[in-house]
């Protein structure tokens, strides 16, 4: 499989940094949450790809609903706008991530917009179901979904599981297994290890991770660092945190 064909596999909507998958939580009403990946290095069969930046914007529309917009800028070697999309995310059942008992359940869906890459000028669609809960001492987020890709309207299926382990007051070790497959393509599966650190009491989180491909269609290695921050456009508020 060539590096170009790897790009046809979809990148998930509204991912929760530094993961490919996401959690069953949304921004509070009138709160803007910014997920910025300011450096990403991907190595596939001795070819390096730099992505800087990647940007996800989450805006709380009203209680338990948010709008999500995202895109990436890729240099390999030309500059391209990749993986643009607009999505709606809704919490169907309040639970751990909303400060209530039980699991949190959410759904996210929306169009995959055209990119500047060759062959990706169409419009696709993606929908994901999300469940978040606790398997002590871990917080776990499970995702599954699918859709139609933007390149040639082929169906795809995606899945992922995130685990988070608090090791200090403002530090979490994190891991993820995730994958995806598209009709006529090999599975793209990978594993992640990293950390999320909150350096102050403000709503700012720094992250770093390394990802290793565990199937032939996945990139060999990926390294990234990024930051997530949020602020209210009305009054200050914070997302419930389960630790």
Predicted features, each with a name:
Residues 1-2:
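Bacterial N-terminal signal peptides that target proteins for export
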Residues 5-6, 92:
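Short stretches within intrinsically disordered, low-complexity N-terminal or propeptide regions
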Residues 8-10:
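N-terminal signal peptide c-region/cleavage motif recognized by signal peptidases
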Residues 13-243:
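Transmembrane beta-barrel domains of Gram-negative outer membranes and organellar outer membranes
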């Amino acid at each position: 499989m060539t590096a170009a064909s790897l790009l046809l596999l979809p990148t998930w909507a509204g991912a929760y940094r530094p993961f490919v998958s996401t959690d069953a939580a949304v921004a509070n009403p009138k709160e803007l949450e910014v997920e910025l990946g300011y450096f990403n290095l991907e190595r596939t069969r001795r070819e390096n790809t730099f992505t800087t930046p990647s940007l996800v914007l989450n805006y709380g529309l009203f209680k338990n609903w948010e709008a999500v917009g995202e895109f990436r800028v890729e240099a390999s070697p030309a500059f391209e706008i990749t993986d643009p999309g607009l999505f709606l995310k809704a919490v169907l059942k309040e639970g751990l991530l909303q400060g209530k008992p039980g699991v949190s359940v959410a759904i996210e869906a929306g169009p995959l917009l055209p990119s500047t890459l060759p062959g990706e000028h169409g419009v696709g669609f993606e929908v994901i179901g999300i469940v978040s809960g606790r398997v002590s001492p871990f917080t776990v987020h499970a995702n599954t979904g699918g859709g139609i890709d933007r390149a040639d309207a082929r169906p795809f299926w995606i899945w992922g599981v995130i685990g988070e382990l608090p090791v200090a007051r403002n530090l979490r070790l994190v891991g993820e297994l995730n994958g995806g497959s598209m009709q006529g393509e090999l599975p793209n599966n990978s594993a992640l290890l990293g950390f999320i650190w909150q350096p102050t009491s403000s709503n700012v989180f720094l992250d770093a991770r390394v990802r290793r491909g565990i199937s032939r269609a996945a990139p060999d290695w990926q390294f990234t660092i990024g930051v997530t921050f949020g602020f209210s456009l009305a009054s200050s508020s914070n997302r419930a945190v389960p630790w």
